[in-house]
Each structure stands twice: as structure tokens, then as C-alpha cells.
From Swiss-Prot:
Gene transcribed to yield this protein: leuS
Name of the protein: Leucine--tRNA ligase
Similarity comment text for this entry: Belongs to the class-I aminoacyl-tRNA synthetase family.
Motif 'HIGH' region, residue numbers: 48-58
Matching SUPFAM superfamilies: Anticodon-binding domain of a subclass of class I aminoacyl-tRNA synthetases (SSF47323), Nucleotidylyl transferase (SSF52374), ValRS/IleRS/LeuRS editing domain (SSF50677)
Keyword Ligase: yes
Primary residence: cytoplasm
HAMAP family per record: Leu_tRNA_synth_B
Species this protein is from: Ralstonia nicotianae (strain ATCC BAA-1114 / GMI1000) (Ralstonia solanacearum)
Cross-referenced InterPro entries: aa-tRNA-synth_I_CS, aa-tRNA-synth_Ia, Leu-tRNA-ligase, Leu_tRNA-synth_edit, M/V/L/I-tRNA-synth_anticd-bd, Rossmann-like_a/b/a_fold, tRNAsynth_Ia_anticodon-bd, Val/Leu/Ile-tRNA-synth_edit
Length: 877
């Protein structure tokens, strides 16, 4: 055993041992020593995109997973920790454009490097289950399930709006549109309607909402999904009109439909707004060039809800009116840039007095504002919006004719009944959730398995011809989809009539790939999409990933699971029983501004920081030139802020165990972790201390493995065992709560106790170090494995990987004596030691005889002795 701790040598030794044993290969129905089935536990981190290198967020995520699985394996569970690659997507195409290399080659090179990095971290991954979503063996089943959904009517085709770059002749993702222009060409982006494929996720809206309740997920994530699904109960009703369309017939059968959750405010309607694509807008624009130009401007705007919420609300009158269904009054119709044709009926009612958006719109354009809700004691005015204007809990109706005096619920019921009686409306439940458009006009993704035939129309690819393989040697040039120009892929034969035909060139949304990869881990070599092994492992016991995936990925995965259930492929309703969303990793930022005032971000490694006598930063300079830089504050590690830490450099300098220890100790898993170079140094020092303690006591520990453990022959033994088992009990509790930062804290207390127990015997010390190594092992597996082997524990207990988790000895926790604070006349004057089972009289007698009592009571006999059990004695003299 080497005297000095060398992380690289220790970690190489441990990893070679695990590799030789194939230590992490897992099978179903593993048996315990007594022949019984081990309970299964499946925990999985969200699979990474193979961007090229791991970042510290990856390190934290996977270490959390690894700690959990190693500890549960020691507790007798059959654990599964797999890994794969979310390998399709736009970044690979962008890299291909920049570097002139095929996305496939770029992706596979990145996978190889990142896999090597993960292995250097010592992660207990079963690599035999590795999955890459760009593999035909994987995406074949994306295609197969799509065809099944097409058969069932869950998948369907309709036109959808996309961002079109007229110069590059390609569709752009929303994030590729910057200030209304294409990110590469700079061209003004157009909106185009093209045929696309959709999945009916809305058919599952109520189930997706209801099934959130029992999940062991953070309430914040549940709320985000609830809001995204967006169940609204209200009234859908019509404003009658006689506006004709191009064919001379009345548009929409003479009814402009809207939906509202505030039917109680219907008497306050002073305008209606329609989407730019609405037939009424198109009709009004025919003789109105200004309106036509405004509509064209709206069509070039974003269709993202987030953008709609923050952009300036604009409108223009159509000169047309519709009829209020209850008053018969004429209501002007406007075109509004904030109204989406894809949401509801493409029209909204405007009630400026009781909707903040409508209030601002009406004030901007001089529209009428009519109060119809009143809250007692609150004056109404049109100059500035007040929160109570929208209060449906305290408000009652005014200026509303027969509805005056009704509260919210009464008014909604009455209005809905009157509208229904006229055949103009009814109560309805609507959903914010929209069907999932999965068509992407991109190359690097799962090909949609359809064929276009001039004679037969759209024809599904026969099941036996799956997968439709994506050519992996194409290099995008930025002008359109490469698949549409590749004859090898495009040209085919119609499976129905045998005539020449063309393949569909759209590929699937990459969220499809991440919908079910965790099930493929259970049966990666399966001849079917999933098999009986999936029934064993699923549903997953613990899912781990970032809060940024709280909505789309998790929602789509839940939907996909329910579709698979309905197709008879799985037997469960929800894929993830518990969810842990780990906090972001933060670091300081530094920058200088260039001549144009643009910030040039500088990596923290290139900066010297000056601090005051309390360690607080007071300035910073660039190492290269010694000149000042601006301290920008603490932010999430990112490429854009250039404040990332390279995990590989950290591992090369300090070792993987130090990286793991710091990321677990610095903060609870669900909270943000602020990077600290001093914290990394501290983690490294702690591991050196643990190693040095093992070296110092190696001989006595190796010699004592045949001895049994007793409750200690001396007071020092008993004190050490009491401390260790007390801390072990707390560590067990913290492991169960996934509070790994306090687990590390417990291990530090154990080492402190061992180092401080100079008078303890070898047996107590041997037992104590054995407990410490097992408690610490899930966090820092390399150093603990080598110490376990070198100090002879493996011979006594077996390898650390499957060593039994240490049991708390309740007998060791029992104290024969306790220390009580001693007060004289209410002031602390020392302490006394009494038997743990001493009664009040015995404690009083011991206190009365104490020398401190005699000294501070000046020889006076006690008038009264107050005993607070387990805490203190107060002698009143």
C-alpha cells in the first residue's frame, strides 16, 4: 500500500478491477444469498445530447444517480443504471455546416469521447445496455409506433404554420429566427402553411392532468405541467353577423365564436379581435391596403406563446361589426397581432374594464371601457389598471341589466343558460394543450415512414421494410433539406401499386427519441419494441434531470407511455414514479467591454481575484495583462458566459473522487451549486486525510479482522462507537432523503472521531473505519475500494461493491453516563456527570456535593435544586 495518495493510480486500479469483473452488468430477477429475488430499483439520468464534452451539470447529474445506485446495491437491491445518447438534432446539422463534416461522423466521435469521460468518473453504468437514438435499431421503433398511431387515428396530417427562410429555402426552428430574420441568411422570415403530421396528445389531456397527483415529483414540476395542459372551464358562444366571404356566403354560418372563462363580464364587451388568418380579416383586407399590410406584418410575427405574451399588442379595425348576443348592440371587429388562429376559434372578446390586456389595448386605440363588475368600496377609473378589476371572488355584476347583483358563479350560470336558449353558446371545457406537431423539415432525425405516390396518395411504409434508413453521409449546405436532394433516399417504389414514388423527406421531432429510450435500456437487443424485461424494470423508480425539461420532455414521455399502454405494449400508466430535478451549477462571471460596448466574457481560470480581509472580492484582473476586468456576478455555467469548468481538467488534476465529493458536498441535490475552487481543494484534502489514516493504522487493522466487535472494553472504545453509530444513524436517514451533502458531512464527522480517538483500541478503530468506508463508498468509490482491499476488509466482508451496508448498533448508542450543565443561582458554573439512569434525588445529591456549588454559593446550603432532565441542574442558594 503506497504511503501517498495518488488519485490517478488509485482510480486506475479500481476501474481495472471493476472492468475485469464486469461489475455493472445487470440481469433481471437477480437472487439474494438466501435464494429470494432481490427487489429491483431502476434509476436513470436524462440521456445527454452528445455535444462533444461533458460539463459540470452532467457530472453532478450522473454522480447523484451513481451515489443512489451504489448505496442501494449494498442494501440488497438489484439496481439498473444505464446510459445512452440523445443523438439526433439541429446542433449536429449546424456543426456539419460549420465544419463540412457529416452529422453522423460528428455525433459518433462525440459519443466516443463523452463515453470515455463518463468511464473516467467511475460511474456504475451497465454499458451493455447503451442506446444511441440515431441508430437504425432504435429509430426503427419510432417509425413502427408512428405507423401504429396512424392506424389508430392518433397520428394525422393537416397544414401547419412554419418559419420559412426565402433565401436558404428552408424551414427554421423558432430559436433560429432572430428579430424576425433567419439566423444564417438574414432574410426576413415568412410564415408558410405546409402539410405536417400531428399526434393527438389532446385526447389524453384529462388523464395527463389527473395522473400527476400521485406522482412523487416536485410540486413545482407538477404545477408547470398543470399550467401547460391548461384546463379551462368556461363558455363558448357566438356573436351573430352577416359578413360575406369570397363565395358570397356568410362566413362561418354567420357566427363568430369565442371562448371565455369570464362569461360574467359579457355585458362589458366593447370589441372583438380576430387573428390575421381569420376569414373575416381576409375579407376586410380586400379593399383596405393598410389593413392588408398589417395582416402581412402579423403573419411574419412569432407563433410562440412566450413571444406573444411579451410582444407589443397591436391592432387595426376592420370596419366590420358583429352583434352582441344578449344586447343586440353592434360590436366592432379588430385584427389583433396577439390572437392566434391555432388557438380556439381564432377570435377573442374584448372586455377592457376587466382584462388587463384588453384594458391596455382599449386605452391605446381609444375603445370604450365599460365597467360591469364592482367590488364594494373600490372606485373604478379608466386611467390606470387596478388588480381588483379582474377579481371574480369578491366582485358582483353592475350595469348588466337582469344580471346585476349576481356573483361570478351565478352570473356564469345565468349567462350560459341564456346563450344556450338562443342556440348561441354552451358551457365547455377547453385545454391550453395543443396536438403535438412532429414534422421537422430537417435532415438529422428519424425519417417519417411514408411514401408519396401520384396514384395512391400517401402510403405507409410496410412494417417489414422498416427501418427507413437515414443516409449518414450527407453534409448539409444550408439550402433546404438534404434528403429532398438525395436520389438514393428520395426515389422508391410505391408498396401499393408498384409505380415510382417519393419518400417523405420530413423527419420526426427529436422529442420523439427521448419519449421511450429508458424502456429500450431494459431490452436493447429486443426483436420487438419492448419485451418482458421492460415489465420487470418499469415503471422507473427514480428519474433525474434538470428543471428545464419539466414540461415538454416529461409530458411527451408520459403521453407516449399511455399510447404504448393502449396498444398493449406496457402494463403501467406512468413511466417515472419519482423525479429529482437537480439544481444548476453556478460560477462567477467576468468580462470586458469592447469599443462597441459589447461584453467579452472571460473564463474564471484566466482571472486573478483580489479580496478584502474577510475574503470578499473587491476587484479582478486578467492574468495575461494584469489589467482590470469587471466582476459580473454568479450565473449558471454556460458557453455564452464563458464561465464553465472543464470536468476533464478537474479530474486530471484532482481525480474523479474529488470532483464527485465536491459536487455532492457543496449543496443538496435539488438546490443550486455554486462553484468554489477552495471547496475543491477542501474535498481533496479530506480524501488525503482518509488515505493517511488508513496507512497509519494499516497493520493493526489487517491483523484484527478475525476479532469480533464488542461494545468496547474501555471508555474510549465506547465513546468512539457511540459517536460512529450515532452519525451512521443520521447518514442512513440522509441517504433515504437523497441529502447527499449531509451524508458527506457525516463521513467527515466519522473521520474526525477516528482521528481524535487516540486511546481507542484497534478493534473499535477497525470497525469504525469499515463503517466510514462503506458510508463514503457511494460518493467516492475509487479510494474507498482500494482502502477496503488494501486494509483486508475484502477478505472479511467481500468486495465493497456488494458489501453489506453497515447496521446501527443500538446498544452502542446507550450512554452509561450523561453530562448536565451546572448552574448556581441561574449562572453557568460548570457541568456534572451523572449515571444515565439517575433519578432526580440522585442528581440533586451529586450537584449538592460539587465543588463549584460550594465555591459560588459561598458555603451556603442549597435552598432549592431545579433539575431539567437531560439538560441542566440549577442550584439556588
Amino acid at each position: 500500500m503506497q504511503d501517498k495518495y495518488s488519485p490517478s493510480e488509485v482510480e486506475q486500479q479500481a476501474q481495472q478491477h471493476w472492468q475485469a469483473q464486469d461489475a455493472y452488468r445487470v440481469t433481471e430477477h437477480a437472487r439474494a444469498a438466501d435464494g429470494s429475488d432481490k427487489p429491483k430499483f431502476y434509476a436513470c439520468s436524462m440521456l445527454p445530447y452528445p455535444s462533444g464534452k461533458l460539463h459540470m451539470g452532467h457530472v453532478r447529474n450522473y454522480t447523484i444517480n451513481d451515489v443512489m445506485m451504489r448505496q442501494l446495491r449494498m442494501k440488497g437491491y438489484n439496481v439498473l443504471m444505464p446510459m445512452g445518447w440523445d443523438a439526433f438534432g439541429m446542433p449536429a446539422e449546424n456543426a456539419a455546416l460549420n465544419n463540412g463534416v457529416a452529422p453522423a461522423a460528428w455525433t459518433y466521435d462525440n459519443i466516443a469521447y463523452m463515453k470515455k469521460q463518463m468511464q473516467s468518473m467511475g460511474l456504475a453504468i451497465d454499458w451493455s445496455r447503451e442506446v444511441a437514438t440515431c441508430s437504425p435499431d432504435y429509430y426503427k421503433w419510432n417509425q413502427w409506433l408512428f405507423l401504429k398511431m396512424l392506424e389508430k387515428g392518433i397520428a394525422y396530417r393537416k397544414t401547419g404554420t412554419v418559419n420559412w427562410d426565402p433565401i436558404d429555402q428552408t424551414v427554421l426552428a423558432n430559436e433560429q429566427v432572430i428579430d424576425g430574420r433567419g439566423w444564417r441568411s438574414g432574410a426576413v422570415v415568412e410564415k408558410r402553411e405546409i402539410p405536417m403530421y400531428y399526434l393527438r396528445i389532446t385526447d389524453y389531456a384529462q388523464e395527463l392532468l389527473s395522473d400527476l397527483d400521485p406522482l412523487g415529483w416536485p410540486e413545482r414540476v407538477k404545477l408547470m405541467q398543470q399550467n401547460w395542459i391548461g384546463k379551462s372551464e368556461g363558455v363558448r358562444f357566438a356573436f351573430p353577423h352577416g359578413i360575406p366571404g369570397d363565395d358570397g356566403k356568410v362566413i362561418g354560418d354567420g357566427k363568430l365564436y369565442v371562448f371565455t372563462t369570464r362569461a360574467d363580464t359579457i355585458m362589458g364587451v366593447t370589441f372583438c379581435a380576430v387573428a390575421a388568418e381569420h376569414p373575416i380579416a381576409a375579407h376586410a383586407a380586400q379593399g383596405n391596403p393598410a389593413l392588408a399590410a398589417f395582416i402581412d406584418e402579423c403573419k411574419h410575427g412569432s407563433v410562440m406563446e412566450a413571444d406573444m405574451a411579451t410582444m407589443e399588442k397591436k391592432g387595426m379595425p376592420t370596419g366590420l361589426t358583429v352583434t352582441h348576443p344578449l344586447t343586440g348592440e353592434a360590436v366592432p371587429v379588430w385584427v389583433g397581432n396577439y390572437v392566434l388562429m391555432t388557438y380556439g376559434d381564432g377570435a377573442v372578446m374584448g372586455v377592457p374594464a376587466h382584462d388587463e390586456r384588453d384594458f391596455a389595448f382599449a386605452n391605446k386605440y381609444g375603445l370604450a371601457i365599460k365597467q360591469v363588475i364592482d367590488v364594494k368600496g373600490q372606485p373604478f377609473g379608466t386611467e390606470a389598471w387596478q388588480e381588483w378589476y379582474a377579481d371574480k371572488e369578491r366582485g358582483v355584476l353592475v350595469h348588466s341589466g337582469k344580471y346585476d347583483g349576481l356573483d361570478y358563479r351565478q352570473a356564469v350560470d345565468a349567462v350560459a343558460a341564456d346563450l344556450a336558449a338562443q342556440g348561441l353558446g354552451e358551457k365547455k371545457t377547453t385545454w391550453r394543450l395543443r396536438d403535438w406537431g412532429i414534422s421537422r423539415q430537417r435532415y438529422w432525425g428519424t425519417p417519417i415512414p411514408l411514401i408519396h405516390c401520384d396514384s395512391c396518395g400517401v402510403v405507409p411504409v410496410p412494417e417489414q421494410d422498416l427501418p427507413v434508413r437515414l443516409p449518414e453521409d450527407l453534409v448539409p449546405d444550408g439550402s433546404g433539406n438534404p434528403l429532398a436532394k438525395d436520389a438514393r433516399f428520395l426515389e422508391c417504389t410505391c408498396p401499393s401499386c408498384g409505380k415510382p414514388a417519393r419518400r417523405e423527406t420530413d423527419t420526426m421531432d427529436t422529442f420523439i427519441d427521448s419519449c421511450w429510450y429508458y424502456m429500450r435500456y431494459t431490452c436493447p437487443d429486443g426483436a420487438t419494441m419492448v419485451d418482458g424485461r421492460n415489465d420487470y424494470w418499469m415503471p422507473m423508480d427514480q428519474y433525474i434531470g434538470g428543471i428545464e425539461h419539466a414540461i415538454l420532455h416529461l409530458l411527451y414521455a408520459r403521453f407516449w407511455t399511455k399510447v404504448m399502454r393502449d396498444l398493449g405494449l406496457v402494463k403501467f400508466d406512468e413511466p417515472f414514479t419519482k423525479l429529482l430535478t437537480q439544481g444548476m451549477v453556478l460560477n462567477e462571471t467576468y468580462y470586458r467591454e469592447d469599443a462597441a460596448g459589447k461584453k467579452q466574457w472571460i473564463n474564471p481560470a484566466d482571472v486573478d481575484v483580489q479580496t478584502d480581509d474577510r475574503g470578499r472580492p473587491i476587484g479582478a484582473t486578467l492574468k495575461a495583462d494584469g489589467q482590470p476586468v469587471v466582476i459580473g456576478g454568479v450565473e449558471k455555467m454556460s458557453k455564452s458566459k464563458n464561465n464553465g469548468i472543464d470536468p476533464q481538467a478537474l479530474i486530471d488534476q484532482y481525480g474523479a473522487d474529488t470532483a464527485r465529493l465536491f459536487t455532492m458536498f457543496a449543496a443538496p441535490p435539488e438546490q443550486q451549486l455554486e462553484w468554489s475552487d477552495a471547496g475543491v481543494e477542501g474535498a481533496s484534502r479530506f480524501l488525503r486525510r482518509a488515505w493517511n489514516f488508513g496507512v497509519a493504522h494499516a497493520e493493526s487493522i489487517r491483523a484484527g479482522h478475525g476479532n469480533g466487535v464488542v461494545n468496547g472494553a474501555t471508555d474510549a472504545d465506547r465513546a468512539l462507537r457511540r459517536e460512529l453509530h450515532t452519525v451512521l444513524k443520521q447518514a442512513n436517514y440522509d441517504y433515504e432523503r437523497l441529502q447527499y451533502n449531509t451524508v458527506v458531512s457525516a463521513a467527515m464527522k466519522m473521520l474526525n472521531a477516528l482521528e481524535g480517538a487516540k486511546d481507542a483500541g484497534a478493534d473499535a478503530r477497525r470497525e469504525g473505519l469499515g463503517i466510514l468506508l462503506r458510508v463514503l463508498y457511494p460518493v467516492v468509490p475509487h479510494i474507498t475500494h482500494v482502502l477496503w482491499q488494501e486494509l483486508g476488509y475484502a477478505g472479511a466482508y467481500g468486495g465493497l461493491l456488494d458489501a453489506p451496508w453497515p447496521q446501527v448498533d443500538e446498544g452502542a448508542l446507550v450512554q452509561s453516563e450523561i453530562e448536565l450543565v451546572l448552574q448556581v443561582n441561574g449562572k453557568v458554573r460548570g457541568s456534572i456527570v451523572v449515571p444515565a439512569d439517575a433519578d432526580r434525588a440522585a442528581i440533586e445529591a451529586i450537584a449538592a456535593k460539587d465543588e463549584a456549588v460550594h465555591r459560588f454559593a459561598e458555603g451556603k446550603p442549597p435552598k432549592k435544586i431545579i433539575v431539567v432532565p437531560g439538560r441542566l441542574v440549577n442550584v439556588v442558594a
